[in-house]
Design a protein with these regions (language model features):
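Short helical patches
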Residues: 1-8, 21, 138, 165, ...
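Juxtamembrane transition segments at transmembrane-helix termini in multipass membrane proteins
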Residues: 2-7, 11-12, 60, 65-73, ...
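Interfacial aromatic "cap" segments that immediately flank transmembrane helices
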Residues: 13-46, 124-154, 186-234
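N-terminal low-complexity, Pro/Thr/Ser-rich intrinsically disordered segments
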Residues: 119-121
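Helix-boundary and loop/linker segments of multi-pass membrane transporters
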Residues: 26-30, 72-77, 131-135, 166-167, ...
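Hydrophobic alpha-helical transmembrane segments in multi-pass membrane proteins
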Residues: 38-59, 82-98, 142-185, 223-250, ...
């Protein structure tokens, strides 16, 4: 018997805040098994390497606290290398995360004419069967990541240019620029679902994302705040082992305690690595919940605003199912 037996709520529809939250929790409740399975297979290896980079970064920092080295260039090069590796791995994991979450959402919301789900039991889908769907989403994920990078680079350059023109860097200027930047973040979050759920170009998608974002600014802030609060509490609790190992190492190094030899031992390094791995993996799982909530906010915005008369229908996700299947058969 199928895992999903009820009629699924349409993806593209107007939603109140309670509807956005309930649709998010309904999706997670119905699909937590395939979601965790796909995320674990795709992202855990990246997390394993990222945990090494993160541990190397903290070890270098605490090692420099314990030594009196004057090799500033060597220290900066080491920090830059490990920090850069951590960021690149984070970007790769984000691409996998976006592709997996939104491919699964399309499969979940693909419906027949009578409203029944096309895919009745996603729990039985193997990673090999799921891979073509995630691969089809990778291009959209790349667009959203590049758009985010462009957004941050442009804003940083604007801030630098404004400060240079005003020839002032007082607290008032910083507060105004900071408030302006924060106000732009909710619309920027709509970049991810716009590229993922619509066949749009790079600049057209960016324009549409910011129109959706500004017109539904309050809704984005409300749903992301609540979902982020819940996920941050869970992630914060599960990150305690890593935080404790990092704090213990920092304390023993700064105090130059006899326990410094213990924090450099194999056992402590293994515990520190595993706790960092758990911390990073849990954070990505938490981010998936935020992506789901933003997607339902996007579905609401499409129905409420109907920009460019785009034909938003859940049966379009059935084409995604068929196209990915045909692609896999080549």
């Amino acid at each position: 018997m199928g895992f999903i037996k009820h009629q699924i709520s349409p993806f593209f529809r107007r939603r109140k805040f309670s509807d956005k939250f309930s649709d998010t929790t309904d999706f997670i409740t119905a699909n937590w098994r395939p979601l965790l399975k796909m995320l674990t297979i795709a992202i855990l290896p990246v997390c394993a390497i990222q945990a090494l980079s993160l541990n190397n970064l903290t070890s270098m920092m605490y090692g420099e606290l314990a030594s009196d080295s004057d090799d500033t260039m060597g220290i900066l090069a080491g920090f830059g290398l490990n920090y850069g590796a951590t960021m690149i791995l984070g970007m790769i994991a984000s691409l996998f995360l976006i592709s997996i979450v939104y491919a699964l959402m399309k499969l979940y919301h693909a419906t027949n004419e009578d409203g029944t789900p096309v895919n009745e039991d996603l729990t039985k889908m193997t990673f090999k069967e799921f891979l073509p769907y995630a691969r089809r989403q990778m291009g959209a994920a790349w667009k959203s990541v590049l758009a985010f990078m462009l957004f941050f680079v442009v804003n940083i350059l604007l801030v630098v240019a404004i400060i240079a023109v005003l020839q002032a860097a007082n607290i008032g200027v910083f507060m105004i620029l900071f408030a302006w930047f924060v106000a732009l973040i909710p619309p920027a979050m709509m970049l991810i679902p716009v590229y993922s759920f619509e066949p749009t170009g790079f600049w057209a998608g960016m324009r549409k994302a910011f129109v959706y974002g500004f017109k539904t600014w309050g809704g984005i802030v409300a749903i992301t705040f609540v979902v982020s609060l819940i996920t941050n509490v869970i992630c914060g609790f599960l990150s305690v082992p890593y935080m404790l190992t990092a704090m213990a190492k920092a304390f023993l190094v700064i105090e130059n305690s006899d326990g410094f030899s213990f924090v450099n031992s194999t056992w402590f390094s293994l515990i520190s690595y595993l706790s960092a791995l758990l911390y990073i993996y849990v954070c990505y799982v938490g981010y998936s919940a935020l992506l789901i909530a933003i997607a339902y906010q996007y579905g609401h915005a499409c129905s409420a605003l109907d920009i460019d008369n785009f034909d938003h229908e859940d049966k379009d996700f059935d084409d995604f199912d068929k196209d990915a299947t045909n692609e896999d058969n080549f």
